[in-house]
Amino acid sequence: MKQIYRLNSFIGLLLILFIGGLSSLAYAERIHLKIALLPDGKHKYFHELLDFAVKAAGHIPVIERAGYMPQNEIWKELLSGGITVHWFLQTPKRDSQLVPIRVPITGGLIGQRILLIPKGQQSTFNRVNSLKDFINLGKKAALGKMWFDVDVWRLNGLPVTTQDGDWRQIYHKVADSVTGFDYFPRGTNEIIEEAMLHPELEIERKLILVYDRDFIFYLSKDHARYQKILEESLEKIKDSGIMDNLIRKYWDAALSILRYDERTIIKLNTPVN
């Protein structure tokens, strides 16, 4: 399977380079990207996608890894130009403060939320068949203070507790049933690895909460010159199937384990700002 993926991706990249008329390396530019690392290798898909994008544009990627940073520090570094690029859920506020690359990059997986819950609590969630049922549970989602999901949950009438500072404290607070920390919504592309790292929690087996938003890349304003290059190249990668191949490479196994197609879908309204 990996050999097929590599062959398909390589062929797709060659086609992009050919179609784009980039056979000459005379115009190749060295694109320097300083990017943060995330715990548990969660950055790998996004780094590989950026590498493909720069190469597909006919340029040479020079990727500098800036080390591990929490999200609030990544945000500050992007605003100051200390790092070049990162991925966030797209919002108008972020669009105004940074330079958006307006190409969705996870196939919507990040907007499809599955719950981490304390062990032994599955029967509580088995009663849920609709958004109204979920609201009536009275359970509070545990979320990072500045996260977009806070706005999504509140818009849909779902109670929230926010964690200031290090959001990773949420795991043990949910496991310990700290008041207000009843469950932790995670992206379908994140939750399997997180559950393995936190065996005191379990993956809720019935529900999937879905809202219409995806990650996009954001550049610091100091690196706005890369916007057109990356936007056009990511569109080519998406159209060629390379992005889908990468998504399958990193997350197909997780989707199978999660029994994605058998879950009860609860659709959530999405804030406009």
Where are these regions (language model features)?
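Ligand-binding cleft/hinge of the Venus flytrap
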Residues: L49-V62, N129-I135, K145-R168, A195-E200
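Acidic, polar ligand-binding/catalytic clefts
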Residues: G67-I135, K145
